[in-house]
Amino acid sequence: MADIHEVVTRSLNINEKLGPRLKAAAEQNAILRIGWTNAGDPVPKNGELGLCPALPEGARLRALGVLGSWVAAFGQGGSFTIQGDAGSFLGAANLGTTVVCEQMAGHFTGYAMADGSITVLDGTGDDAGAAMRGGILVIRGASGARIGGGMEGGLIVVHGDVGPDPGAGMSGGRIVINGRCPPPAPGVLLRPLEADEVKEINATLDDESLHVPSDAVCLMAQEKLHFEHGGFVVSSGDLSQIGLINEENPPLRTYQTVDTVALIGTRDEVKSLALPVPLLANLVSGSTMSPDGNTPADVTSILNRHPALVEAEPRAVDVMLIGQSNLLDVASWLPDAGGFAVDLDELPPMNAEQLDGLLVALRSVASTNVPVVLIQGISRIQALHARAAYHGVDVAMARIEDGSGLSEAAALPMMGRSKKEHLQGTMTQAGLLLGFAASGHDLAVLMASGVDLVACVAPTADGEDIAYWLQGTQDDLAHHLRRIGLSSVDLLDRKHLRALDQETAAVSGLRLAGYGRPLPHWFAR
């Protein structure tokens, strides 16, 4: 078996070579082939992943061999046929591509698809059609557990047996099963097909070998009361009870220049993003940071040089935050972004191979060598840092508001221990995603604790107000650096921090102001 890093490199190279050929082949109505030599001799692929993302209209591809995860994801049109097996997330976030897998497909086939069709001719793994919003998924052969889980629309047809918990959490769409079906999940209705439905479905399938018989059953969501989730438990504090001191250096002059610049991505091959202050504003849309003709020149200058973490319409300096809610927009928006962040909490749990497949697909859609960020809850920071280092991403960012209720002060020693264990000696930076708008003091405290980059919600949705907040935060950070006698944010260290009360000292392990040492329980074995 080839080394996984070799597989990733091969996969990226295949996508890079295919890119310029797709448009020309579509204009000539030609089929591009993967797994054959130029002379037509078969050379089956073995494990290549993330292949052929965001296929455009008119593209026609055929692949031979056993492929990995996230193949033909984010499709916009055209067709993709696999003569062999496919891994997990085949055709995920499909918006119009016709995908055919002539043998078996893995878990999460058709995940979050909204249009197009996917046909698998020898069964699938678990969670086929999960989070599906539209389109058609046809499976011949057995399918695993939770088929159609969380689906909102579309049609799934299974000619074979399905596993336990079919339709779990579905709120729309139909699952037609021509085979054995266990009792459906709560809130799901199992009923026979009506004659008109059989005709309508078979007309939609347009393939006699896949037509459903009249004795097939249909699963649909039942009407039920909708309970609006109240959201995560928020953290129990902020960073106001942590002070900044320097017992060694005198203060700098009030007019002395200090360095507050930070980079996203420190590898030589990465197109790093420069931040005037180590802070990314977390916004819904990059258009919020796009000045118009009436915006003052100084505000325009601030907005243009500050990257942001956005879910939609990224600018060339922005990092696009990718989760289930905007997977369908990846092909449209990601090429314009200066980097991307994968929200692991918003996507299904993935093993190393599946995450590699997603990263290959996204890197192939994005601009060349942009920085990559992984985001996950603070309670899973050890796993996050280990995965980030293994996959060679640029930033591992822990989200404070993950439902655990852990405070920012309690997160600091967790961050420090995990960074030392997993990120030391790597080029992966440690980040923190806050649930409140950070100040310059907050940034100084976090930088001194070993955090390289902070993202947080903006205090306002108005672009001009955001510009004033960003400039004020930079000035506040510079003021604290001058006050404690440091010329650069890179010189901040844990020795500059003091807990201002016992509760903060107890959970953070910082020296208690006045006592001069951490509380005794931090030394207990």
Predicted features along the sequence, with ranges:
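Conserved active-site and cofactor/substrate-binding residues in soluble primary-metabolism enzymes
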Residues: 75, 94, 108, 113, ...
